[in-house]
C-alpha cells in the first residue's frame, strides 16, 4: 500500500467517493464520520495526510485541526462547503495546510 490517508467527513456519499478515488491510486484510507472519532484515529495511527471537513458532529473540524496540531505536523486539508474567505482564513489559522471547497 501507498500513503496513509485519514478522511473525516459526516457525509457518507462524499467519503465513499473520496475513498474509492484514493484507493485507485493505491492509498490506504481510513474514515471517520465525526470529529471525536477523527481525532481519536489521528492520535492512534500515523497518517501522511488528513482530509478534514469543517462542519462535523460532536467536534467541528477547526477544533479537530487545532488539537491535531498539538501532537502532529501531518498535512491537513480542510474539505468544506463553506467557501467564504473568512472561513478559509480561520481554517488556515487553526493549523490547516490547505482548504478545498465542495463540490470539487
PLM regions: where:
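N-terminal/domain-start alpha-helical segments
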Residues: 1-104
